[in-house]
A protein has these predicted regions:
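Flexible, glycine/threonine-enriched loop-and-boundary segments that flank and lead into catalytic domains
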Residues: 50-61
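Hydrophobic faces of well-ordered beta-strands that scaffold small-molecule active sites
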Residues: 66-68
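Anionic group-transfer/hydrolysis microenvironments
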Residues: 71
Length: 122
């Protein structure tokens, strides 16, 4: 999120090349330059997980189960794709070669185009 903030909230595909595909040296420089901002987001994640754990414990102790859908894909604009491009089917500029979706069925006569990049299983 810190690097996204530096790039005015734009998707990583619209960032300058040095940010889109940073060298290890540039990553180290970013980590040092934006240590305070990175720490802020780490703290927010800590708060969320702490509160989520407390909520789950509270609900479970009262016989309430919190259930949810497990995502099968990640967002194209996620840190996961940005940091691990080799794990996804992307072209040399980072754009997806294909995206996830489903064909027409009884839920949708036209099918659904989800837009998530596909995993590179090889």
């Amino acid at each position: 999120m810190s690097v996204k903030d530096v790039n005015d909230g734009r998707i990583w595909l619209d960032w300058p090349e040095q940010f889109r595909s940073p060298s290890e040296e540039f990553k180290t420089q970013l980590t040092q330059t934006y240590a305070k901002e990175i720490g802020y987001y780490q703290f927010l994640q800590f708060l969320f997980f702490t509160e989520w754990k407390d909520l789950k414990t509270y609900a479970n102790e009262r016989g309430i189960r919190i259930i949810g859908d497990i995502p099968l894909f990640v967002s194209m604009d996620s840190a996961d794709v940005w940091a691990n491009k080799h794990l996804f089917q992307l072209d040399t500029t980072g754009y997806p070669l294909a995206v996830a979706g489903v064909p027409p069925d009884y839920f949708s006569a036209t099918g659904q185009l989800w837009g998530n990049p596909l995993y590179n299983w090889e």
